[in-house]
Amino acid sequence: MSTIARKKGVGAVLWDYLTTVDHKKIAHLYLISGGFFFLLGGLEALFIRIQLAKPNNDFLVGGLYNEVLTMHGTTMIFLAAMPLVFAFMNAVVPLQIGARDVAFPFLNALGFWMFFFGGLFLNCSWFLGGAPDAGWTSYASLSLDSKAHHGIDFYTLGLQISGFGTIMGAINFLVTIINMRAPGMTFMRMPMFTWATFVTSALILFAFPPLTVGLIFMMMDRLFGGNFFNPAAGGNTIIWEHLFWVFGHPEVYILVLPAFGIFSEIFATFSRKRLFGYSSMVFATVLIAFLGFMVWAHHMFTVGMGPIANAIFAVATMTIAVPTGVKIFNWLFTMWGGSIKFTTPMHYAVAFIPSFVMGGVTGVMLASAAADYQYHDSYFVVAHFHYVIVGGVVFALLAGTHYWWPKMFGRMLNETLGKITFWLFFIGFHLTFFIQHFLGLTGMPRRVFTYLPHQGWETGNLISTIGAFFIAAATVILLINIVVTTAKGEKVPGDAWGDGRTLEWAIASPPPVYNFAQTPLVRGLDAFWLEKMEGKKELTPAEPLGDIHMPNSSFLPFVIAFGLFVAAFGFTYHNDAGWGLPVAILGLLITLGSMFLRSVIDDHGFHIHKEEVLEL
């Protein structure tokens, strides 16, 4: 049986994506879902900025403002940035290491559907009484008091389901990169984006379990009468802060390290030279990940840990600036002496350096424990983390979208529209967040929904809101670009930019279902570039052409995740309604039954015969 033939019709395409285990199509699913949640989180941000545009505004007040604020942060971190990072990991990493798929294709699909249904469950709260309203960190002191509706319960269960999917993805990429690299691809010949994915997956493996434990504790307290965080019964709300931030700070690097990997690929490609200091970049990536687990309590300087603990975490936090600085200078030296081509991805890459450095500088300021008593819970902190997350991660996601779009879809996004998007986004970003440093320094606290006239915050907030509309305009133009490209964009060859250095650019755009007809032989770093420099148009094969084994599609990942989605509703309402417990049991039976079917039914996949490959 073969699935090489393109399927026609909306129904066939929909079924294909619902049942796919192909890493490239799963990348499309992550990209579409993450893009949707990015738009949703952006809309929530726009509502926040409209409310704060003038004093005593009543556009979005009180509890509703708290819900929108909470969902903005939660959506952007867990449901937009994370899946978009996973989209590029899925689309690119197997191609960069010369593999035909990931190690566990079924688990890859299950990971996506777990994320999707977790995010869907979380957003159902909007229509079922109210969304989470305790901030994206959902501190226990606020969450346990939020009993007016089930918003926090949607938060705890939705993030658990989504988090399980993320952990599955991390395990999958660790095994894939360790076991499935093409012959000759040693660890020190891997592209930087693959290195970033490898280290990030290890981070996820250790960072997400503490969050999962915290969410289980929170769920037990709220739904089953537990007292983990209830001081009146001997619990401690500070435990939640430690559990959350042991996850929360590594989460920054879970997002930023893949961004660094994307920029490393872009700088090398469009400077038309090898990445400067490759070995030091690898070690800096590993060191950042290691130090990332030693700094979580800098979020808690004002909690009362004492001067010794504060000093230790302050020094550890400042230390992370060293390997990050190594990366910044290596990118600059990569451009130095290069023949730079200023494409849309390169615009984002160059703009990232000053933007991210500004976020890093304010990070070192916040790392001073004594000074943090002034900065804490002010708009200075809001400005800082947006300079890091938007200036680092979102710039990288936009750069990666333009850079790998032709590889994923076979068509080039319009460069003129791309550069208009960039300039609007760049100007809007700095307009929105630069002024917020000064709002914070003049005393504006974060999370407030209004302020009085004559406090000196009117002008800054108005400028910030105007900047947000620039970002919105940039997003609209990006969507127009995608629609126009899909309708009539120019088709591209395998090496879409003409300067590709890594293996993904050596095959067709978009790649065939099997990726590589023959597993390539890797003879050095920047393997495709080496072949081109020797005048070869194709990679050197490491094996003769033969039949290719591929996994079958399966509907079970969708059903397993859907079962947990159903069960989550039952657990949420089991104290309020008689149907709660039966629905929870039904959902678990759907999930466990599907897992049983997966265990007992033999599925050996199928083969694509070499004659079919030759025809293509």
Swiss-Prot record:
It is found in: Cell membrane. Under slightly air-limited conditions, the cytochrome a3 center of the enzyme is replaced by cytochrome o. This cytochrome c oxidase shows clear proton pump activity in addition to electron transfer across the membrane. It catalyses: 4 Fe(II)-[cytochrome c] + O2 + 8 H(+)(in) = 4 Fe(III)-[cytochrome c] + 2 H2O + 4 H(+)(out). Binds 1 copper B ion per subunit. Binds 2 heme groups per subunit. Pfam families: COX1. It is a multi-pass membrane protein. Keywords: Cell membrane, Copper, Electron transport, Heme, Iron, Membrane, Metal-binding, Respiratory chain, Translocase, Transmembrane, Transmembrane helix, Transport. Heme a3 binds at H384. GO terms for cellular component: plasma membrane. Fe(II)-heme a binds at H72, H386. It comes from Bacillus sp. (strain PS3). Gene3D superfamilies: 1.10.287.70, Cytochrome c oxidase-like, subunit I domain (1.20.210.10). GO terms for biological process: electron transport coupled proton transport; oxidative phosphorylation; respiratory electron transport chain. This is Cytochrome c oxidase subunit 1. Pathway: Energy metabolism; oxidative phosphorylation. Its EC number is 7.1.1.9. It comes from the Bacteria.
